[in-house]
């Protein structure tokens, strides 16, 4: 392998939507940083059967609904 061409691979902490945390190795951030998830298997409709509440992070859902309101879906 060539030296100094690969990103730094280190431990980070991942925080799920329910507050649980775990450590994984990643190239994201710096050693010891915490990645907070907006959507995870506990809250994603594909894994919950659509029973989880849809979160409007940053107003994206509202913007989409307003943009396509006249189509009658």
From Swiss-Prot:
Function: Binds the 23S rRNA.
Species for this entry: Paracoccus denitrificans (strain Pd 1222)
Subunit: Part of the 50S ribosomal subunit.
Record flagged with keyword rRNA-binding: yes
GO molecular function: rRNA binding; structural constituent of ribosome
Pfam families: Ribosomal_L31
GO cellular component: ribonucleoprotein complex; ribosome
Keywords: Ribonucleoprotein, Ribosomal protein, RNA-binding, rRNA-binding
GO terms for biological process, alphabetical: translation
Database matches in InterPro entries: Ribosomal_bL28/bL31-like_sf (IPR034704), Ribosomal_bL31 (IPR002150), Ribosomal_bL31_A (IPR027491), Ribosomal_bL31_sf (IPR042105)
Name listed for the protein in its UniProt record: Large ribosomal subunit protein bL31
Domain of life (superkingdom): Bacteria
Family: Belongs to the bacterial ribosomal protein bL31 family. Type A subfamily.
